[in-house]
Amino acid sequence: MEQKLDLRVIKTQNNIKNTFIQLLHQKDFQHITVQSILDKSLINRSTFYKYYTDKYDLAESIIQDILKEFSFFLDERFSGKEKDDLLPIIKNVYDKSYEEKDILSALWTINTDSIHLYDDMQQLLMDKYKFYMAKPAPANKDLFNYKACIYASLVMTTLKYIFDNNDPNMSQKIIENFNFSALW
């Protein structure tokens, strides 16, 4: 019986999250209210507050899940594999991101003091680059930080480009035509 309850909870939370993402595509975050989420998701107020304290908590919850998965992909990407082994991993990250482009692009539009997914992803890319590429210690720390910044910017710009072109094969085209040796 408890498994049914868990399934209902999952369905309810997914309904709330999906409704929130739909609303982000229709209006700015500041104009979304809990009431608009309730109306569109067809749930009552107590159900919403059972899981989230407000729309900020909802957004942060979704973002934390995304960052956790993104971090996992980055750990795999930096796992010490050879260049030929990396290309399928990198393509997988781009493809998975493309599958989630509606969610990511909606959440990228939020930029508050506490919610800024695009910047968080870029910072995570920089941090992972620095952590994994710092062995052995870089000869020039300033240039090392610059490379980390360029790497993060390149990945985020590539993701945005893939989303904007709305072509499911774009990641393959990029992987085939880009020389990753400079930063990868």
Please report, for each region that a protein language model flagged, where it lies by residue.
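C-terminal peripheral helix-coil segments that are non-catalytic and often amphipathic
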Residues: 131, 152-153, 157-184
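Cytosolic nucleotide-binding catalytic cores of signal-transduction proteins
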Residues: 3, 24-27, 139-143, 158-160, ...
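Basic, helix-initiating cap at the start of DNA-binding domains
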Residues: 1-23, 27, 36, 40
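Amphipathic alpha-helical packing segments from all-alpha helical-bundle domains
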Residues: 111-137, 142-149
